[in-house]
């Protein structure tokens, strides 16, 4: 949805439906793993008392985070599109997107200008460990950072609970 009004209304309606489903008092928090968005890859779906989120293997990031009382998706922040924004980014958006920047790229980034090559936002992370019972997901990714042609490995562990998510690198 490029029309943000429709997109926001859709998220709101989905969260209102989620609230109705939970009214029976039998809701149990869970972190499950399945192809949630029908892209052929598994996602980690976090249904907690106060929020709903999913973590994608593409970018290893949270692509949807909805606080139930606010009925909105906090990750609803699409990448810039040249036609509409006058500039374009080479990386995906979401929470806990991993970036490596040179000093000049970082200066651009903090000025809200397109920066970096976004390599970790576009690659597929792999599952290192998943514990449904402990509500933990550990992902890893290998990439080459272009400015120095240096091989980089990122490992991050999501710890999910009623209060939120913690990420350990």
Give residue spans per PLM region.
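Histidine-centered catalytic/metal-binding microenvironments
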Residues: 1-57, 61-65, 70-96
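Extended, loop-rich substrate-binding clefts of extracytoplasmic carbohydrate-active enzymes
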Residues: 100-165
């Amino acid at each position: 949805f490029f029309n943000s009004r429709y997109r926001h209304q859709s998220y709101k309606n989905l969260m209102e439906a989620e609230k109705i489903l939970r009214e029976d008092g039998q809701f149990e928090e869970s972190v499950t793993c399945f192809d949630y968005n029908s892209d052929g890859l598994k996602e980690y779906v976090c249904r907690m008392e106060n929020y709903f989120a999913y973590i994608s293997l593409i970018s290893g990031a949270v692509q949807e985070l909805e606080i139930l009382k606010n009925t909105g998706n906090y990750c609803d922040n699409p990448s810039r599109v040249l036609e509409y924004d006058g500039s374009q980014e080479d990386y995906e958006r979401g929470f806990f997107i991993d970036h490596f920047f040179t000093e000049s790229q970082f200066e651009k980034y903090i000025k809200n200008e397109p920066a970096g090559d976004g390599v970790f936002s576009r690659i597929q992370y792999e599952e290192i460990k998943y514990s449904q019972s402990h509500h933990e997901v550990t992902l890893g990714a290998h990439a080459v950072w272009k400015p120095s042609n240096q091989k980089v490995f990122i490992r991050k562990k999501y710890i999910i609970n009623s209060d939120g998510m913690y990420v350990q690198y």
